[in-house]
């Protein structure tokens, strides 16, 4: 614990805030060729450099689809591809948002379905906005 004299001389310093999705807080200045830390953006655009599957941590078992994405701020991150089936491949342009996948270490971002080169999930009826699925045709009413 500091003494009164130390507090008078130096004061208290606040701890640096740690961000859960740091890549969204950096922006690239093409004129100065520098990356700057800023207020952040809700989404970022990027290009897939690798699309693959990986296995989750201990109690779970699956083949989770992930993509390595090079963002517009020149950072490279690993993002999760939600939903069943996808059309992503190398050089696909995608939009990412923050949000980790608890059982995949190092995956802190999600790819937004239904935007840019990412197709929405086919035949999805519930929670469609999360997966970029269009409203399906309503079933015709039965006649008596």
Curated annotation (Swiss-Prot):
Feature: compositional bias, Basic residues: 131-144
CDD domains xref list: Ribosomal_S12
Spans annotated as Disordered: 125-144
Keywords: Methylation, Ribonucleoprotein, Ribosomal protein, RNA-binding, rRNA-binding, tRNA-binding
UniProt modified residues of type 3-methylthioaspartic acid: 103
InterPro entries noted in UniProt: NA-bd_OB-fold, Ribosomal_uS12, Ribosomal_uS12_bac
GO biological process: translation
One CC-aspect GO term: small ribosomal subunit
Pfam families cross-referenced by the UniProt entry: Ribosom_S12_S23 (PF00164)
Molecular function terms, GO-annotated: rRNA binding; structural constituent of ribosome; tRNA binding
Subunit field text: Part of the 30S ribosomal subunit. Contacts proteins S8 and S17. May interact with IF1 in the 30S initiation complex.
Family affiliation: Belongs to the universal ribosomal protein uS12 family.
Function: With S4 and S5 plays an important role in translational accuracy. Interacts with and stabilizes bases of the 16S rRNA that are involved in tRNA selection in the A site and with the mRNA backbone. Located at the interface of the 30S and 50S subunits, it traverses the body of the 30S subunit contacting proteins on the other side and probably holding the rRNA structure together. The combined cluster of proteins S8, S12 and S17 appears to hold together the shoulder and platform of the 30S subunit.
Protein name per Swiss-Prot or TrEMBL: Small ribosomal subunit protein uS12
Organism per entry: Dehalococcoides mccartyi (strain ATCC BAA-2266 / KCTC 15142 / 195) (Dehalococcoides ethenogenes (strain 195))
Taxonomic lineage of the native organism: Bacteria, Bacillati, Chloroflexota, Dehalococcoidia, Dehalococcoidales
